Amino acid sequence: MYDNLKSLGINQPEDVDRYSLRQEANNDILKIYFRKDKGEFFAKSVKFKYPRQRKTVVADNAGQGYKEIHEINPNLRYVIDELDQLCQRDQVEVDLKRKILDDLRHLEGVVSHKIAEIESDLEKLTRGK
């Protein structure tokens, strides 16, 4: 699993925190950030440079003939797919944690409100005697 990342020298893909991708001239620059260890100020990162693939395609207009386009490198596409799997898995875990915490806060509010309601009813009963 994660063979493309391992081929880049990333032997522990589970340590990947996030990544960024930008284009510079005819290259795509991939920067992969790893989780910070305790006491570190900055996350470790590695940078990879992929040349964009040049393709000649038929132009839309019949009179223009052909035009050259630049596309993302196929190898980079596979690496990004693996990075997305890793990063989205982390996002799902964070979303689940947030949902559980939100549910707990809601439950806490409901229980507090119900306790106040019961105490109010008890107060009414004791005042009546």
From Swiss-Prot:
Protein name per its UniProtKB record: UPF0325 protein Spro_3794
A Pfam entry, by short name: DUF3461
Organism: Serratia proteamaculans (strain 568)
NCBIfam families in the cross-refs: PRK13677.1
InterPro entries: UPF0325 (IPR020911)
Classification via HAMAP family: UPF0325
Family recorded in the similarity comment: Belongs to the UPF0325 family.
